């Protein structure tokens, strides 16, 4: 008997199984196809706005995704470099096949982890507690806990034009049947969501004299804090083009055969990743939409047509593609399609990702209504950590909104109405100046170490880095930069300092002043500073912390206020009916979501500040 069974080996399942095994639990990972683990069923990329931050957080906690993309990436870019550091987001194109092969090797090398090719079609529950899983082969396997990471496989239905086929991820992969019904019988409620993917085309059929080349960054930072430099790594270009008025006219001729407009698709699709037909229908004033041509690997001719997600008939798809500049002779290898699938509203899970209806049963990934590889991987990681800790009778690890984007993600899931596929944005995080990609290790290594996923040496390195930041900051506050040196460093039109010089910490708040420039101008100063730390990553942290010092102090004060509400626990059996003074809507929402803390309750739409005040009085605070 295993401690933990993980059903599904996508991005959530892989991280869940690795986290469980690395934290000391025996784990079995079950997949319908073990050659397709961590498959990138949609875009061949990791990271991007907010998603890059999540990927680095996964790494800081001891997960695998960042290492995988560093090893298999084919193009690396830092997005939003023209904006402040809170908005900088790493993104990488992946070699889709190599990524799966890398993750398969990692899974097979893990000591406490076994793999099984089969399909989970049901669960057994005894006395409100998880007991075992039922397999398609007829076997029943017992375990202490289970994590369901089913992706889009639950009663999956694929749509291409007016045709539809049962499919879990592609037409070639069958859906999972029986598991939804088993969960409903155990007390869960389910609904349908929809997502889609663009066609893939043969990159040899693209006219590269017309499309715009997009190269990767020359010296990109790695995703993983443990990877070392990836500068000099071979990269491959992406390409940019756009739809035309003719494209839109062609696609409109297929609207009468679109499952989206005919009502065949009942599931709600992702608001922020609409299909091309939806974009044309909703934004009639737009003459064109950007199309990004993204290679799927070094050793394949398949190209992903980002921005052209569609479920229109195949003849309309190919005609539309061939109306796009640079794609007049394009050959379509695989058509785009939409897929409907079952999910379970995340109001049915706790912050630990354990379900409320069945003890020791956890949900992670698209089963909770999210979209995106990174969001799924983050949930899998936390579910694996917390399932393992639950079996050891240890408290769950809860990341707060001020700790990580992962904390924002999980908090949003358990407090908001998730009626469409949820994806993370930087705007979702009110503390995004604190939650930067560059400081994920400083924020989260302690949690990974507590969970048993970050070893002692790595944790000591992080503590040493943090100490160097503190000592370097103190040094810069104590050292005065001579006025003449500052004059030479500042642009002529800038405000000149008063006589007497300026502390180095204050000078670094001026535009254009960096530690490297100060080091170049003042060799003795540089020598003294480098005795404290010669680590450029330490220098980067010091510069950011000083430049945004006032803003960071305000954010930290705000997090302290929120922390007081987070410390007030609401028992799961709390009797809201007995609390006089609650609004009727507030009581209804509190009964539906059953928040675990007063802070969580305060973020539920429909729960007013006066409702929170009433609860504080009831709790005796």
From Swiss-Prot:
List residues binding FAD. 8-13
One Pfam family cited in the UniProt record for this chain: SAM_GIDA_C
Q: Which InterPro entries match?
A: FAD/NAD-bd_sf, GIDA_C_N, MnmG, MnmG-rel, MnmG-rel_CS, MnmG_C, MnmG_C_subdom, MnmG_C_subdom_sf
Q: List the disulfide bonds.
A: none
Which positions make up the signal peptide? none
A GO cellular-component term linked to this record: cytosol
The subcellular localization recorded is:
Cytoplasm
* SUPFAM superfamilies, alphabetized: FAD/NAD(P)-binding domain
A GO BP term here is: tRNA methylation
Major location (coarse): cytoplasm
User: In which domain of life is the source organism classified?
Assistant: Bacteria
Q: Which residues form a coiled coil?
A: none
Keywords assigned by UniProt, alphabetized: Cytoplasm, FAD, Flavoprotein, NAD, tRNA processing
Report residues binding NAD(+): 269-283
A GO MF label = flavin adenine dinucleotide binding
The protein's required cofactors: FAD
Query: What does the similarity note say?
Result: Belongs to the MnmG family.
Query: How does this polypeptide assemble, per the annotation?
Result: Homodimer. Heterotetramer of two MnmE and two MnmG subunits.
User: What biological function has been recorded for the protein in this entry?
Assistant: NAD-binding protein involved in the addition of a carboxymethylaminomethyl (cmnm) group at the wobble position (U34) of certain tRNAs, forming tRNA-cmnm(5)s(2)U34.
The identity of this protein, by name, is: tRNA uridine 5-carboxymethylaminomethyl modification enzyme MnmG
The protein's organism comes out as Chlorobium phaeovibrioides (strain DSM 265 / 1930)
Q: What is the lineage of its organism?
A: Bacteria, Pseudomonadati, Chlorobiota, Chlorobiia, Chlorobiales
Encoding gene (name): mnmG
């Amino acid at each position: 008997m295993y401690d933990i069974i993980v059903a599904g080996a996508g991005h959530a399942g892989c991280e869940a199984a690795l986290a469980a095994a690395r934290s000391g639990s025996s784990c079995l990972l079950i997949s319908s196809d073990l050659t397709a683990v961590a498959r990138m069923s949609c875009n061949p990329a990791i990271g991007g706005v907010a998603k890059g931050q999540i990927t680095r957080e996964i790494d800081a906690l001891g997960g695998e995704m960042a290492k995988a993309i560093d090893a298999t990436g084919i193009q690396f870019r830092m997005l939003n470099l023209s904006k402040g550091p809170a908005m900088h987001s790493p993104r990488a194109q992946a070699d889709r096949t190599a990524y799966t092969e890398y993750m398969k090797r990692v899974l097979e090398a893990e000591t406490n982890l076994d793999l099984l090719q089969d399909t989970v079609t049901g669960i057994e529950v005894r006395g409100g507690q998880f007991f075992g899983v039922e397999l398609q082969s007829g076997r029943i396997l017992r375990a202490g806990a289970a994590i369901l990471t089913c992706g889009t496989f639950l009663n999956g239905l694929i749509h291409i034009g007016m045709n539809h086929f049962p499919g879990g991820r592609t037409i070639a992969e069958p859906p999972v049947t029986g598991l939804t019904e088993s969960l409903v019988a155990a007390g869960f409620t389910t609904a349908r969501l929809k997502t889609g993917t663009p066609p893939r085309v043969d990159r040899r059929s693209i006219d590269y004299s017309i499309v715009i080349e997009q190269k990767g960054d020359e010296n990109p930072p790695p995703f993983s804090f443990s990877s070392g430099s990836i500068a000099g790594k071979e990269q491959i270009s992406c390409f940019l083009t756009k739809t035309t008025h003719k494209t839109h006219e062609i696609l409109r001729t297929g609207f009468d055969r679109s499952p989206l407009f005919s009502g065949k698709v009942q599931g709600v699709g992702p608001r922020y990743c609409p299909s091309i037909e939806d974009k044309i229908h909703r934004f009639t004033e737009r003459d064109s939409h950007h199309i990004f041509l993204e290679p799927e690997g070094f050793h394949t001719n398949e190209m992903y047509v980002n921005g052209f997600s569609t479920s229109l008939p195949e003849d309309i798809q190919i005609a539309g593609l061939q109306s796009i500049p640079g794609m007049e002779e394009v050959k379509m290898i695989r058509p785009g399609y939409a897929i409907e699938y079952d999910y379970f509203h995340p109001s049915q899970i706790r912050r630990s990702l354990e379900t409320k209806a069945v003890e020791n049963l956890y949900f992670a990934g698209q089963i909770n209504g999210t979209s995106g590889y990174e969001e799924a991987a983050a949930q899998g990681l936390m579910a694996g950590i917390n399932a393992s800790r639950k079996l050891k009778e240890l408290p769950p690890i809860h990341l707060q909104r001020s700790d990580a984007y992962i904390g924002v993600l999980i908090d949003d899931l358990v407090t908001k109405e998730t009626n469409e596929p949820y994806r993370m944005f930087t705007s979702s995080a009110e503390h995004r100046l604190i939650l930067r990609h560059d400081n994920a290790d400083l924020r989260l290594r302690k949690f990974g170490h507590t969970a048993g996923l970050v070893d002692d040496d790595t944790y000591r390195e992080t503590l040493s880095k943090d100490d160097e930041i503190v000592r370097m900051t103190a040094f810069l506050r104590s050292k005065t930069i001579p006025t003449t040196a500052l004059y030479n460093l500042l642009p002529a039109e800038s405000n000149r300092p008063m006589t007497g010089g300026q502390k180095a910490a204050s000078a670094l708040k001026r535009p254009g002043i960096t530690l490297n420039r100060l080091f170049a101008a003042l060799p003795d100063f540089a020598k003294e500073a480098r005795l404290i730390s010669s680590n450029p990553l330490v220098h980067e942290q010091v510069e950011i912390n000083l430049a945004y010092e006032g803003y960071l102090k305000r954010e930290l004060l705000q997090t302290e206020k929120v922390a007081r509400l987070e410390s007030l626990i609401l028992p799961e059996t709390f009797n809201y009916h007995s609390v006089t003074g609650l609004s009727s809507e507030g009581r209804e929402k509190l009964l539906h979501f059953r928040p675990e803390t007063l802070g969580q309750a305060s973020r539920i739409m429909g729960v007013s500040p006066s409702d929170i005040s009433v609860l504080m009085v009831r709790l005796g605070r």
